[in-house]
Amino acid sequence: MKRNDPCWCGSGRKWKQCHYPQPPKMSPEALKQHYASQYNILLKTPEQKAKIYNACQITARILDELCKASQKGVTTNELDELSQELHKKYDAIAAPFHYGSPPFPKTICTSLNEVICHGIPNDIPLKDGDIMNIDVSCIVDGYYGDCSRMVMIGEVPEIKKKICQAALECLNDSIAILKPGIPLCEIGEAIEARADTYGFSVVDQFVGHGVGIEFHENPYVPHYRNRSMIPLAPGMIFTIEPMINVGKKEGVVDPKNQWEARTCDNQPSAQWEHTIAITETGYEILTLLND
């Protein structure tokens, strides 16, 4: 259905003037076909969602154990070695390992201080004052989970505490509004509105994404103000992973490893991520660890 088509409710008005952006009242199978043809978005079945939830819970558990192991003096390579052990323990595959071009060389991303995302583990020990995002993505029984969290090492400067808190609030604010019918752009609006209250910037080079059957699927989820009017619908599963900078929003990708993105002004950056499912009445955070 396009915006200028007659509204599905039978009012005779255009969809954009009537029930837009609410999706048509269809059977689950018809709605799934509509989203596949109109937006190239795969709405997950309850059976698929259950498998994705299992993958997300294992992903969240691995992330939790890695965060607990992140202490002063530990290297991120040691965290990657622990990650390999945990993936074996939970019968999971590390989705980032050898992903992309050039192939990503590790099983997790560890992004410290001014590194926005895709940090590659190395032999440098963690030290007092570091902040670090650990990003874990797992494949379990062929289904994907994806989440990340910030860790603070020892005594951390106030500005770093502030950027970690701001990024978490950006994520939480954007999740709180989720329900069927709202346009995708409201996610970015919520994130940028919260970042504005801190005077921080929102990275626009990297976005959230559909996930579950593949590592990266439609829809792509901008974390900044945008005009995407795709209405959320039950069965959509995607990540929200806002990257928030103290200074300028621009990032620079390392020309040597072609993965690590750093802030252009070397100011700190922070990111938190969850995988979320849209339900009939709202949302479910699939990577919220259920003990």
Curated annotation (Swiss-Prot):
Its cofactor is Co(2+); Zn(2+); Mn(2+); Fe(2+). It comes from the Bacteria. SUPFAM superfamilies: Creatinase/aminopeptidase (SSF55920), Sec-C motif (SSF103642). Substrate binds at H118, H216. Keywords: Aminopeptidase, Hydrolase, Metal-binding, Protease. Transmembrane segments: none annotated. A divalent metal cation 1 binds at D135, D146, E273. It catalyses: Release of N-terminal amino acids, preferentially methionine, from peptides and arylamides. Binds 2 divalent metal cations per subunit. Has a high-affinity and a low affinity metal-binding site. The true nature of the physiological cofactor is under debate. The enzyme is active with cobalt, zinc, manganese or divalent iron ions. Most likely, methionine aminopeptidases function as mononuclear Fe(2+)-metalloproteases under physiological conditions, and the catalytically relevant metal-binding site has been assigned to the histidine-containing high-affinity site. HAMAP family: MetAP_1 (MF_01974). Removes the N-terminal methionine from nascent proteins. The N-terminal methionine is often cleaved when the second residue in the primary sequence is small and uncharged (Met-Ala-, Cys, Gly, Pro, Ser, Thr, or Val). Requires deformylation of the N(alpha)-formylated initiator methionine before it can be hydrolyzed. This is Methionine aminopeptidase. The gene is map.
